Curated annotation (Swiss-Prot):
It comes from the Eukaryota. Belongs to the FAM72 family. Induction: Up-regulated in gastric cancer. This is Protein FAM72D. GO terms for cellular component: cytosol; intracellular membrane-bounded organelle. Signal peptide: none annotated. InterPro entries: YPEH2ZP.
Length: 149
């Protein structure tokens, strides 16, 4: 597997908001495609969203691969906004992937490009710290203007 093909460092980082209630769900989102069906657009994140989503329903498996999934719903409005890959299958782990296991449906969330510390340039994945210093409250208290923008 070539490093160039699987590099995600030049991808834009996004703030992900629920389309139903405008709740901020993640500040580390990235556009993604479903490995099992590249026609399906998604957003993903590497860190579990805290105080924004929770699991709902039972675990299930896809027809295309053997990943074990569980839906996630927005805590503010209750709508299903995506799913978590509870147990990735070996086929998906061996393919080119970004190691994000929190997935958001493009029909349920919208994205806002996140800016770097200068406030001018779009923040790129390669410049995003693995674990951010901000508290959960900092992430979730993004202004309504920022979410509506």
């Amino acid at each position: 597997m070539s490093t160039n093909i699987c590099s995600f460092k030049d991808r834009c980082v996004s703030i992900l908001c629920c389309k139903f209630c405008k709740q901020v769900l993640s500040s580390r989102g990235m556009k993604a495609v479903l490995l099992a069906d590249t026609e399906i657009d998604l957003f993903s994140t590497d860190i579990p969203p805290t105080n924004a989503v929770d699991f709902t329903g039972r675990c299930y498996f896809t027809k295309i691969c053997k990943c074990k999934l569980k839906d996630i719903a927005c805590l503010k409005c209750g709508n299903i906004v995506g799913y978590h890959v509870i147990v990735p299958c070996s086929s998906c782990l061996l393919s080119c992937n970004n190691r994000h296991f929190w997935m958001f449906h493009s029909q349920a969330v919208y994205d806002i490009n996140r800016l770097d510390s200068t406030g001018v340039n779009v923040l790129l994945r390669g410049n995003l710290p693995e674990i951010e210093e901000s508290t959960d409250e900092d992430v979730l208290n993004i202004s309504a203007e920022e979410c509506i923008r």
